[in-house]
Amino acid sequence: MSNKMWGGRFGEGPDAIMEEINVSIDVDRHLYAQDIAASKVHAAMLAAQGIITADDAKNIDKGLDTILSEIRNGTFDFKRALEDIHMNVEGRLGEMIGAAAGRLHTARSRNDQVATDFRLYVRDVIDETDAALAAFQHALLTRALEHSGTVMPGFTHLQTAQPVTFGHHLMAYVEMAARDRGRFADARRRLNESPLGAAALAGTSFPIDRDATAKALGFDRPMANSLDAVSDRDFVLETLSAAAIASIHLSRFAEEIVIWTSPLVGLVRLSDKFTTGSSIMPQKRNPDAAELVRAKTGRVVGALTGLLIVMKGLPLAYQKDMQEDKQGAMEAFGALSLAIRAMTGMVADLVPDEARMKAAAGDGYATATDLADWLVRTLKMPFRDAHHVTGRIVAAASKQGVALHELALQDMQAVEPRITRDALAVLSVEASVKSRTSYGGTAPKNVRSQANAWLKRLEKERKLG
């Protein structure tokens, strides 16, 4: 006969391989706080509904508090034979308070129990991630204000395109992080329904109060369908999707830092705090923090892909496949958390080489569009014609091996006789960025205005809690 808590109908215990593949305590032990919180609420509801006695509920609550302390101080004995966090907690509770512990599982299954625990866990992850992304935004905004007028090259196809400001470039990641936070917030809203009380799949015949347990656990409402409640993992998938997109944003920025810190480019420098050396080459300073942020994206995207594949063919309701929903997700959430903190540190740490940035901003005839715009504004030339004329002027400068602003006026006039000396004023990189005053443009005053507005918004969020 099996000695498992579920073993009443079994004539013998499981094979050792079955034990090994079935156990999940190494992973779901991380749900201990959520499991205990949900059990305390469930016990209180059972007592309020007259399903168990008030004394039993009191003993259960006190015992769960003790177990929570034991886990936190490292004295709790996790037993692999008990499979998971739910049975480990219930088993220890039975050792402490006896038969009353067996009443805790009334009107509840491990199916709705784990669904509740994991929703609470993911909700906590979302809240922590939002706070981390807000701190990342604050670091970006602080540096954007410092460098609202620092000119650097803007790129398309990794080729110099037009001058921008370093502050404007950093502000792009503020906006990306804002969308990331919005996606996490959306996921949280859909997540915030309680599966507790759905039992195995069909609900229960006991007169439970699901509204009360949902409210006590901070959920907006109980889930409306018991089958859906125990078999849904959309909340994990959606949160992993938000995490994957956020990690891709961080990876893009990390890639830029790797490129910018290369001696061949030399636009920024990271201090020793965020670089490492080589075991053989004494001179090396490697941007390993940025490279590892870039690499961790694979773990996050991989976790999303893995869970999508796990869930794709599962009929209703709960299937043991769903036990594989946690490890990859937990690792992904941890990887994202570390990546955000690392990027926040690097943003505060990096030092731009302003002279090199300014010089690079003018490379590749980056102010050619400014000349074309001058032809449109001053000579009323159609833009397509202005584009063609400017292209010929760029070709002339390239043939002479000079920058656009170094080309003689008469050489420009050889292409378009109506060009005047006034056109030369628009060819400096400073004039170029100052002229981009359209909403969302790179003009320093735009950057300062948007950065200050964002800082006020973050401060308002902080005060609202």
From Swiss-Prot:
Keywords: Amino-acid biosynthesis, Arginine biosynthesis, Cytoplasm, Lyase
Gene3D superfamilies according to UniProt: Fumarase/aspartase (C-terminal domain), Fumarase/aspartase (Central domain), Fumarase/aspartase (N-terminal domain)
Keyword Metal-binding: no
Pfam families for the chain: ASL_C2, Lyase_1
Enzyme class of the recorded protein, top EC level: lyase
GO cellular component, one term: cytosol
Keyword hit for Lyase: yes
Pathway(s) the chain acts in: Amino-acid biosynthesis; L-arginine biosynthesis; L-arginine from L-ornithine and carbamoyl phosphate: step 3/3
Chief location category: cytoplasm
Entries under PANTHER family matching the protein: ARGININOSUCCINATE LYASE
Catalysed reaction, written as an equation: 2-(N(omega)-L-arginino)succinate = fumarate + L-arginine
A GO BP annotation: L-arginine biosynthetic process
Protein name: Argininosuccinate lyase
EC nos: 4.3.2.1
